[in-house]
């Protein structure tokens, strides 16, 4: 009997198209050999072309989900994605504190890949002041980092200043993702006063639905397995590159990645 499987919890929204949110997180965690659990913050009606509806769960039900997970299968790492309201953020912060959760990775999801807004304005301050200080790592893209830092980011030097400002304000490590609107796939990790660049080539693939969810859940999976943060980020970036390079082509808009591109099994056969 296998007793030593590592575990991770995704606290995020559900994506009906399966490319982002908890669906992407569960695929990613499973691909890393980690047992995935979820606490759903919202149901979304979305596909590769956009978000058409969001149905938020109640704070009480989110609280019940978190209690159910933490009192039974305690997660080795926690990834937090889409949380659209201040009330839900407060529930998460309280439960993570009460249960002394470890290896918390926050992906401050504010806008979907399609451009649809995913968080209420009043929730941003709650995210900043109640959730980010609990994080081991926060993984903003450039627009999100501009909101969190209050700075305009137009070059790598701006990225370093913004990452430093976020880290010093909220006392967490920051992985600032440069691929959003800079012409490269270089990401910056700022931790304990030190900047580390992760250089990457931009893969010519328009199907990038769920890349942020996937990267943060890959990092959380690696932390759950005992990796140091820098190694966890490096490994997660390699995984993302592989998933993008697999060139899955589904949907009419920005399609999903192949999260299981490296899964080799006699039970899996290629579709003709």
Annotated model-derived regions:
Residues 90-98, 172, 186, 194, ...:
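Nucleotide and nucleotide-moiety/phosphate-recognizing core
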Residues 33-37, 196, 222-236:
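Phosphate-handling active-site elements
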Residues 23, 146-147, 205-229:
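Short, small-residue alpha-helix embedded
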Residues 2-10, 30-106, 110-113, 117:
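Conserved N-terminal subdomain of the carbohydrate kinase-like
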């Amino acid at each position: 009997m296998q007793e030593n499987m590592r575990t991770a919890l995704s606290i995020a929204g559900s994506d009906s198209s399966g490319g982002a949110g908890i669906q992407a997180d569960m695929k990613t965690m499973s691909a890393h050999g980690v047992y995935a659990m979820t606490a759903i913050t919202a149901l979304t009606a979305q596909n590769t072309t956009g978000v058409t509806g969001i149905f938020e769960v109640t704070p009480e039900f989110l609280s019940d989900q978190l209690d159910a997970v933490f009192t039974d299968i305690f997660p080795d790492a926690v990834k937090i994605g889409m949380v659209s309201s201040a009330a839900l953020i407060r529930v998460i912060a309280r439960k993570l504190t009460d249960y002394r959760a470890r290896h918390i990775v926050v992906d401050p999801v504010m806008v979907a890949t399609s451009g649809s807004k995913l968080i209420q304005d009043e929730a941003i301050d709650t995210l900043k002041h109640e959730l980010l200080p609990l994080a081991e790592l926060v993984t903003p893209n450039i627009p999100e980092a501009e909101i969190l830092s209050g700075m305009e980011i137009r070059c790598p030097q701006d990225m370093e200043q913004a990452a430093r400002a976020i880290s010093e304000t909220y006392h967490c490590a920051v992985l600032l993702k440069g691929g959003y609107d800079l012409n490269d796939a270089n990401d910056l990790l700022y931790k304990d006063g030190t900047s580390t660049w992760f250089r990457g080539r931009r893969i010519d693939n328009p199907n990038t639905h769920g890349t942020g969810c996937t990267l943060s859940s890959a990092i959380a999976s690696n932390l759950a397995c005992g990796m140091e943060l820098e190694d966890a980020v490096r490994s997660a970036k390699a995984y993302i590159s592989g998933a993008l390079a697999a060139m899955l082509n589904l949907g009419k808009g920005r399609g999903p990645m192949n999260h299981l591109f490296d899964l080799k099994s006699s039970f899996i056969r290629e579709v003709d």
